Amino acid sequence: MGKTQSLPILITGGGRRIGLALAWHFINQKQPVIVSYRTHYPAIDGLIKAGAQCIQADFSTNDGVMAFADEVLKSTHGLRAILHNASAWMAEKPGAPLTDVLACMMQIHVNTPYLLNHALERLLRGHGHAASDIIHFTDYVVERGSDKHIAYAASKAALDNMTRSFARKLAPEVKVNSIAPSLILFNEHDDAEYRQQALNKSLMKTAPGEKEVIDLVDYLLTSCFVTGRSFPLDGGRHLR
């Protein structure tokens, strides 16, 4: 990452799972990290102790997004990268107003990265050719669609499209790409039957874990040429 290594990497939703693994990966590389979190999981205390700057944020409103952006602007003169990992998962189901489901999914997956990319643009610029990055975390369902999570899939598709628009806007100083994962790791409460059904959906029949994501993120950060692209992490699921 060269001369920009002293600049922090911002990870939204960094308190658990993939976001947390990414935060520790960079900390272990002596790379400064800023993490947003909504709920104070015990892991946040560990990140703070290790030197990460952890900022509590509520992305459910635009005011909350902009308040977080203001905190970032106060805390650093530049950013090495923004990793938009914060996510929510809502299904269309009886009792859940459809307007609320759609608004929630669009707020976290579209409004939040859109507003943050604009608000923090000046922190990414001025560091040299292809010296900064934005990475959007989308989803495998962008390609396939989902009959049970229509609003979720639509919001992730919008984020995928924004990848190309921001790549055009911010080049050549900032590279903008997206990662579209399917199953990466299970939740602790997932039972054996569910796990096997999920594994059978891909050709590779495995949940690769966070390292697969970390390796791809590292590739995108070190590339000086790749921008405006989406990278599937689906184990060949599209061929099933």
Curated annotation (Swiss-Prot):
A biological process from GO: one-carbon metabolic process
Identification of the protein by name: Dihydromonapterin reductase
Function per UniProt: Catalyzes the reduction of dihydromonapterin to tetrahydromonapterin. Also has lower activity with dihydrofolate.
NCBIfam families on file: PRK06483.1 (NF005066)
Record keywords: NADP, One-carbon metabolism, Oxidoreductase
Catalytic activity: (6S)-5,6,7,8-tetrahydrofolate + NADP(+) = 7,8-dihydrofolate + NADPH + H(+); 7,8-dihydromonapterin + NADPH + H(+) = 5,6,7,8-tetrahydromonapterin + NADP(+)
Family: Belongs to the short-chain dehydrogenases/reductases (SDR) family. FolM subfamily.
CDD domains in UniProt: PR_SDR_c
GO MF term (any one): dihydrofolate reductase activity
Gene name of the encoded protein: folM
Active site location: 152
EC category: oxidoreductase
InterPro entries: NAD(P)-bd_dom_sf, Sc_DH/Rdtase_CS, SDR_fam
Species of provenance: Escherichia coli O1:K1 / APEC
Short name of one Pfam family: adh_short_C2
EC number: 1.5.1.50, 1.5.1.3
